[in-house]
């Protein structure tokens, strides 16, 4: 579970909601919340994290809820998609042969702007036209394939098909602004159904060139 902005202040409510959901069946059976750990998803040396809550604890333990972004500074960045990415055009999911740098980066930009508006009360002050032009200038190398992914919706009482593309994407000629959004996307994910965990990626150092991160 990744909480952004003001949602971080609702951690206790989220824990309670999970406890209640587990008691009233999640998926096809009941479960029990036994522990909550705080993990820094951007820490390459992360282990199991630090326990901040268990049912026998009266309060959520004090903990650092911040993460520090590492922004790529090299002239080539490669990412590896861990869960299916669903970019769409006119309501149709884009397969590997239809992916474009504009579709990828402008999806990241829009998501970042919306999160800022809902969590900080105002959208980011962005020049969307300029960012679109910078996206068009990026050289894209796609090494991806389609992966079907399904989940069961208890509310709709049916299986939902949420397939997307997985694999690697390499970007050349990235502007500084796009590098920032690429780093932010490590936490926000990219594409449709990101709230379900889709569109999650990591930096692939095997395909990175330049002097590392800022």
Language-model features: locations:
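RNA-interacting cores
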Residues: 1-214
């Amino acid at each position: 579970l990744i909480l952004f902005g003001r949602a971080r202040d609702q951690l206790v409510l989220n824990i309670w909601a999970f406890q209640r959901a587990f008691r009233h069946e999640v998926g096809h059976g009941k479960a029990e919340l036994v522990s909550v750990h705080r993990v820094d998803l951007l820490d390459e040396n992360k282990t199991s994290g630090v326990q901040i809550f268990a049912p026998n604890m009266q309060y959520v333990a004090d903990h650092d809820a911040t993460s520090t972004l590492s922004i790529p500074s090299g002239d080539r960045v490669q990412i590896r998609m861990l869960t299916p990415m669903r970019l769409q055009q006119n309501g149709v999911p884009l397969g590997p042969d239809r992916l474009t740098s504009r579709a990828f980066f402008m999806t990241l930009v829009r998501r970042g702007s919306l999160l800022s508006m809902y969590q900080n009360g105002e959208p980011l002050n962005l020049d969307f036209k300029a960012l679109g032009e910078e996206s068009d200038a990026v050289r894209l190398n796609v090494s991806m394939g389609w992966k079907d992914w399904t989940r069961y919706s208890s509310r709709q009482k049916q299986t939902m098909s949420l397939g997307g593309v997985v694999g690697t994407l390499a970007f050349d000629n990235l502007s500084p602004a796009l590098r920032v959004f690429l780093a932010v996307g490590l936490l926000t994910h990219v594409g449709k159904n990101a709230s379900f965990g889709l569109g999650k990626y990591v930096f692939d150092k095997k395909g990175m060139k330049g002097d590392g991160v800022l």
